[in-house]
Amino acid sequence: MNLHEYQAKSLFAEYGLPVSEGFACDTAQEAVEAAGRIGGNLWVVKCQVHAGGRGKAGGVKVTGDKEEIRAFAEHWLGKNLVTYQTDEKGQPVAKILVESCTDIANELYLGAVVDRSTRRVVFMASTEGGVEIEKVAEETPELIHKAIIDPLTGPQPYQARDLGFKLGLNPTQMKQFTKIFMGLATMFVDHDFALLEINPLVITTEGNLHCLDGKIGIDGNALFRQPKVKAMHDPSQDDAREAHAAMFELNYVALDGNVGCMVNGAGLAMGTMDIVNLHGGKPANFLDVGGGATKERVAEAFKIILSDSNVKAVLVNIFGGIVRCDMIAEGIIGAVKEVGVKVPVVVRLEGTNAELGREVLAKSGLDIIAATSLTDAAERVVKAAEGK
């Protein structure tokens, strides 16, 4: 689950981190009034969506005119903002963040993720602020400095100082950076973050550190114990199909191909997508129906997959372990009849009662293609998607 910038900054403020005074507004009039409450003669107004690249897409504006703030809010509220990180539809803008303007002397990067290889929270800092960290990692990885947090001892001030020295901070800035680092590390664990970014973390013209932006991703598996953060969820930013899938405990991620994939198990699902790619196809989705692939869940999975008009064929790849393949086959048949599937369906069954499952499919009288292996299934579904 992701948070908006204004939500991230509200958490930053709770932990004593330096952020701009700002207000998230629902209407143009609120935005104008927010500028008046902030004071000064220069403000920054930002569209609030779960995507980067807002500035280049016209979703960020610096202005000293309150009427320009009104016009900006009237233009964007209720519309979709399209950036390089969204699809062609973009994401809806329901709030505008109005903030005081910050004079910038330099831009840094500070972020943290859960590193699965070390099984630790890893902080990353760089002098290349304001730039996509992925680009820095690819082109100049030596400019990214890391600190690994030991879960037994927690974050240590010396780790912050080590990063601060590498960023070239002066003694005053070092103290500020240490406070920011310790606050972020504590916040990361307290709220079960999966991702945290301040890009940029700026040095102002007065020489102080300031959190100019904020990006936070929460571990969805931990939301049951994070009611405060869970309440910040903005469903308007979710893909409609992904949100519908979650209601049925289906793990679905929309992609841009034409081969729908329905698989039980995340690892098998990724392997299925890989082999479809290997044979020249493009997966339209990642969909893991999990271990309890009942008729109802399979039917909903078909509905979700087929709600994508780009899908020209569907590959069902099931490994029967706890779940018997003959039961899965009956579920597939029932789902195909219920949904009225009009695209080719290729089914590969392996594991418990796989042969019986294939017999059930063969006797159904439906236009279901039973594959003999995963390679055979991939070849057949790619050809079917191409109309061959």
Swiss-Prot record:
Residue ranges of domain ATP-grasp in the record: 9-244
Cofactor note: Binds 1 Mg(2+) ion per subunit.
Residues noted as binding ATP in the record, renumbered to the chain: K46, G53, R54, G55, E99, T102, E107
GO terms of biological process kind: succinyl-CoA metabolic process; tricarboxylic acid cycle
Any one GO molecular-function label of the UniProt entry: succinate-CoA ligase (ADP-forming) activity
Residues that coordinate or bind Mg(2+): N199, D213
Pfam families: ATP-grasp_2 (PF08442), Ligase_CoA (PF00549)
SUPFAM superfamilies: Glutathione synthetase ATP-binding domain-like, Succinyl-CoA synthetase domains
Reactions listed under catalytic activity: succinate + ATP + CoA = succinyl-CoA + ADP + phosphate; GTP + succinate + CoA = succinyl-CoA + GDP + phosphate
The enzyme's E.C. designation: 6.2.1.5
Family stated for the protein in its record: Belongs to the succinate/malate CoA ligase beta subunit family.
Name of the protein this chain belongs to: Succinate--CoA ligase [ADP-forming] subunit beta
Lineage: Bacteria, Pseudomonadati, Pseudomonadota, Gammaproteobacteria, Alteromonadales
Gene this chain is encoded by: sucC
